[in-house]
C-alpha cells in the first residue's frame, strides 16, 4: 500500500484525483482527475515512475478500469463529458483505440466483466442509461438501455460462476460465463440485469431491490462463488445494505443493514469476498466480516 500512497502524493495531477486502480499484476497504477487527464505509473517495490499521461476527455475523468490481461494492455476511462474512451498499449506506446459517445450526460463509472464472460465493459451514466461495450473479432459492439430514471451511479458484475456450482457435482448449464450485473441509482434502487440471448440484450432479472431512502452511491457484487451471492450497496442515507441470495433460491434476496454516522460513498470486497470495506463522508474506512451467526461485525476502522 505504501507505493500506492506515494504515487498519489506525487501524482503530477493539477486537480482532485477521483480514481486510482492497480492492474491485474499490481505493477501499474492508473489515476484520473478533474484536470481531464489519466496518468499511468510503473510500480516497482516502494518506488514508482510516471510513464504516460493520457489526454482525450473534455471534462473531469471520474473512473478508470483495467481489462483482464488476456485481452492485452487495455484501459477504459469515463468522464463528465459523457464519453467512454478505450486505450491500448502496444510496444510501449499508448493509443486511443475507441471512443464511445452515445451517453447524453456524465458517465460515472466503468467496470469490466469477469474475463470468462468475454471482454465486456459496463458503463453507468447520469442520463439514466447503462451501456455494455463488447470487444470481439477486433471490433466494438454495444448495447445501451434505460436503467434508472434519475441517473445511474454504479455498476458491478456478478462472478462468472454461479454460487454453489463449484461445490456441486452437477453445476448445470450456464454455470460459467454468467453475464449478470447490478446497478445502483439516484432513484434509491438496486437492479439486477442478465443477458438474454434471445434478444441479444440485457433484461431486468427481478423486481428492484428497495430499502435505501437516498441515492445509492455504490454497489459491489462479492467475487465469492461458494453457497451464497452477496451484494453490498452504499448510500447517501448513511447505511450499507448487504443483500444475500442462496444457491437454492437464487431469485430471493435477504437484506442486512449496517448503520453509519455519515453518508457512505464506496464499498469494496476483498479478493476472497469475505471482507467488506466501506468508505464514508467522515474520512473513515471500516472493514466488516460476517460471523458464524450471520451477523456483520466491524473488525477494523481506519481513520485519516
Curated annotation (Swiss-Prot):
Alphabetical keyword list: Cytoplasmic vesicle, Endoplasmic reticulum, ER-Golgi transport, Membrane, mRNA transport, Nuclear pore complex, Nucleus, Protein transport, Repeat, Translocation, Transport, WD repeat
Protein name in the entry: Protein transport protein sec13
Record's function text: Component of the coat protein complex II (COPII) which promotes the formation of transport vesicles from the endoplasmic reticulum (ER). The coat has two main functions, the physical deformation of the endoplasmic reticulum membrane into vesicles and the selection of cargo molecules. It also functions as a component of the nuclear pore complex (NPC). NPC components, collectively referred to as nucleoporins (NUPs), can play the role of both NPC structural components and of docking or interaction partners for transiently associated nuclear transport factors.
Assembly and binders: The COPII coat is composed of at least 5 proteins: the sec23/24 complex, the sec13/31 complex, and the protein vtr-7/sar1. Component of the nuclear pore complex (NPC). NPC constitutes the exclusive means of nucleocytoplasmic transport. NPCs allow the passive diffusion of ions and small molecules and the active, nuclear transport receptor-mediated bidirectional transport of macromolecules such as proteins, RNAs, ribonucleoparticles (RNPs), and ribosomal subunits across the nuclear envelope. Due to its 8-fold rotational symmetry, all subunits are present with 8 copies or multiples thereof.
Molecular function terms, GO-annotated: structural molecule activity
Cross-referenced InterPro entries: Sec13/Seh1_fam, WD40/YVTN_repeat-like_dom_sf, WD40_repeat_dom_sf, WD40_rpt
Organism: Neurospora crassa (strain ATCC 24698 / 74-OR23-1A / CBS 708.71 / DSM 1257 / FGSC 987)
UniProt record similarity statement: Belongs to the WD repeat SEC13 family.
WD repeat ranges per the UniProt record: 12-51, 56-97, 102-143, 147-203, 211-253, 259-298
Record membrane topology: Peripheral membrane protein
Record PROSITE patterns: WD_REPEATS_2, WD_REPEATS_REGION
Entry superkingdom: Eukaryota
Gene name tied to this protein: nup-20
Main location per the UniProt record: membrane
UniProt-annotated location(s): Cytoplasmic vesicle, COPII-coated vesicle membrane; Endoplasmic reticulum membrane; Nucleus, Nuclear pore complex
GO cellular component, one term: COPII vesicle coat
Amino acid at each position: 500500500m505504501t507505493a500506492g500512497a506515494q504515487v498519489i502524493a506525487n501524482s503530477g495531477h493539477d486537480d482532485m484525483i477521483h480514481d486510482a486502480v492497480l492492474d491485474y499484476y499490481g505493477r501499474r497504477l492508473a489515476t484520473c482527475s478533474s484536470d481531464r487527464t489519466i496518468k499511468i505509473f510503473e510500480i516497482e517495490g516502494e518506488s514508482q515512475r510516471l510513464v504516460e499521461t493520457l489526454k482525450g476527455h473534455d471534462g473531469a475523468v471520474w473512473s478508470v478500469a483495467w481489462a483482464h490481461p488476456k485481452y492485452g494492455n487495455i484501459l477504459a476511462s469515463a468522464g463528465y463529458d459523457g464519453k467512454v474512451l478505450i486505450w491500448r498499449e502496444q510496444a510501449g506506446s499508448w493509443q486511443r483505440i475507441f471512443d464511445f459517445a452515445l451517453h447524453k450526460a456524465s458517465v460515472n463509472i466503468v467496470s469490466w466483466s469477469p474475463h470468462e464472460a468475454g471482454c465486456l465493459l459496463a458503463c453507468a451514466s447520469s442520463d439514466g442509461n447503462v451501456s455494455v461495450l463488447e470487444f470481439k473479432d477486433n471490433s466494438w459492439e454495444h448495447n445501451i438501455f434505460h436503467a434508472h430514471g434519475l441517473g445511474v451511479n454504479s455498476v458491478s458484475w456478478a462472478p462468472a460462476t454461479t454460487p454453489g456450482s463449484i461445490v456441486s457435482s452437477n453445476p448445470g448449464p450456464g454455470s460459467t460465463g454468467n453475464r449478470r450485473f447490478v446497478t445502483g441509482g439516484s432513484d434509491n434502487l438496486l437492479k439486477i440485469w442478465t443477458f438474454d440471448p434471445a434478444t441479444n440484450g440485457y433484461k431486468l432479472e427481478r423486481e428492484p431491490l428497495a430499502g435505501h431512502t437516498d441515492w445509492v452511491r455504490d454497489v459491489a457484487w462479492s467475487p465469492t462463488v461458494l453457497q451464497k451471492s452477496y451484494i453490498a450497496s452504499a448510500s447517501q442515507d448513511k447505511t450499507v445494505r448487504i443483500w444475500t441470495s442462496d444457491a437454492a433460491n437464487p431469485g430471493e434476496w435477504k437484506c442486512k443493514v449496517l448503520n453509519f454516522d455519515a453518508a457512505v460513498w464506496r464499498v469494496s470486497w476483498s479478493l476472497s469476498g469475505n471482507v467488506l470495506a466501506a468508505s464514508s463522508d467522515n474520512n473513515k474506512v471500516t472493514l466488516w466480516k460476517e460471523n458464524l451467526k450471520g451477523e456483520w461485525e466491524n473488525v477494523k476502522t481506519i481513520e485519516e
